[in-house]
Amino acid sequence: MERGAGASEKGTVLVTGASGFVGSWLVMKLLQAGYTVRATVRDPANVGKTKPLMDLPGATERLSIWKADLAEEGSFHDAIRGCTGVFHVATPMDFLSKDPENEVIKPTVEGMISIMRACKEAGTVRRIVFTSSAGTVNLEERQRPVYDEESWTDVDFCRRVKMTGWMYFVSKTLAEKAALAYAAEHGLDLVTIIPTLVVGPFISASMPPSLITALALITGNAPHYSILKQVQLIHLDDLCDAEIFLFENPAAAGRYVCSSHDVTIHGLAAMLRDRYPEYDVPQRFPGIQDDLQPVRFSSKKLQDLGFTFRYKTLEDMFDAAIRTCQEKGLIPLATAAGGDGFASVRAPGETEATIGA
């Protein structure tokens, strides 16, 4: 444990993967909501990861940093002990792994069960919220027009085809299924939230992987166009609000898709060209047909529970993300006609695709 944190009326909750895109924003929202937060990171000595968290309003009084690693059995036990809630966001992402079964899939699933076991042993955790992924829902031989919580990715298909990021899809799917089974067997209250491609502002200094994909039409990162072909999106703020909503709502149970927009690459490109004429956004996409129909992820279950999305348009979703990237110098303020000379932005270790959640 790095620093102490005072108690709060809302109680103490844990956030895993707290230095990441979603985790850091969730920490901020929980502090704003009045919770005392324990944030886990793999290396508390890494000031570049922890300082943005400790600089958040309320952090001095109600945030503490804890060392924990999904690859180390039992490393979350101390951090979870005494918490009333656990938000599990952390997940290994290594698309270049030479041994994905043992380096990505196994630690993801075993880390999930280790956290579930720690929650059971703590005896104080009233609910666990697991941040899953759209990759647990729609990876299969043939795409359907609509997906919901009843849909599951075909892991055998992923292992056979080995599309870019296949190990991530498999690991998240198996981890979620294992967690749901463990919760049912041991009487734990587990809710899983399934975000689509996450867009929004961010705290960290580097470009979040999901924004490398979401802003590919601006940066000229052509390998990501296939991901944007029929894409579903959620604003980071809406996602974190939904996580807290599901934690606090007594009626919440099971899986919840969290997605507010679906669009084809053509619709997204048209919006970006109109909204940001200073960028050279492509108009044609070789190999992608012009008459695409969107593929929808239904958030009806979440909305029927009473949750309302605040970001109503694509413009609302992208404005803060683009502004933050500009302010941090991660994308240029404009690109010349044709986009010549602009280097694509990539995350460390990234190959041809990046997964949002």
From Swiss-Prot:
GO molecular function, one term: oxidoreductase activity, acting on the CH-OH group of donors, NAD or NADP as acceptor
Tagged with keyword NADP: yes
Residues that, per the record, bind NADP(+): 49, 168
Class of this enzyme: oxidoreductase
Single GO biological process annotation from the record: anthocyanin-containing compound biosynthetic process
Cross-referenced SUPFAM superfamilies: NAD(P)-binding Rossmann-fold domains
InterPro entries registered for this protein in UniProt: Epimerase_deHydtase, NAD(P)-bd_dom_sf, NAD(P)_dehydrat-like
Pathway annotation: Pigment biosynthesis; anthocyanin biosynthesis
Record's catalysed reaction(s): a (2R,3S,4S)-leucoanthocyanidin + NADP(+) = a (2R,3R)-dihydroflavonol + NADPH + H(+); (2S)-flavan-4-ol + NADP(+) = (2S)-flavanone + NADPH + H(+)
The enzyme's E.C. designation: 1.1.1.219, 1.1.1.234
Annotated Gene3D superfamilies: NAD(P)-binding Rossmann-like Domain
Domain of life: Eukaryota
Stored Pfam families: Epimerase
Keyword set, alphabetical order: Flavonoid biosynthesis, NADP, Oxidoreductase
Function noted in UniProt: Bifunctional enzyme involved in flavonoid metabolism.
Family affiliation: Belongs to the NAD(P)-dependent epimerase/dehydratase family. Dihydroflavonol-4-reductase subfamily.
Name of the protein this chain belongs to: Dihydroflavonol 4-reductase
Annotated organism of origin: Zea mays
Gene that specifies this protein: A1
